[in-house]
């Protein structure tokens, strides 16, 4: 009986250590992209397994609205949170986080990975539209061109991964007027009055440019404001 009790205690301790290992492993992976396989799809969340068989959760609200996955599909997502629930590691993934888009750019654009180009800000309405502000520390590198690639070669893969999310890459600048002008692209701006005290800007443009500035469903102006 004492041998059996010892064996049970040992098994429980090993299981506990394994859980701690998974927790610590993923705690270090927060903000990183992982590849997994869809194991189960429920109404409110999806169960994903990594290559070691660890269970990861992708909640519905962290999925792009047009995402459609079935059991056995490969899936790419970013780790956003790791918790312990009832002594079990609970690893939460996201495909809607701006960090996911940032990491996709790092994977596709060597200049970002190497630190020659910095992503200053990312704002997105998942599956619809995103704006990414980038800056280069080397005058010889065009940060926007490097991110888009020849004939869009670098950005196409990212757009596909994000279910055809429309991505605007803009050149970051400390010049507020120029930054606002670029953020509101493709609308052509005539004049900008900046109210520093209230952190507001009045933007003037020709009547035919207004709908472009606002964008479909107000997305362009919403994202420009967030940027």
Residue ranges and their predicted role:
Residues 1-227:
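RNA-contacting regions in translation and RNA-metabolism proteins
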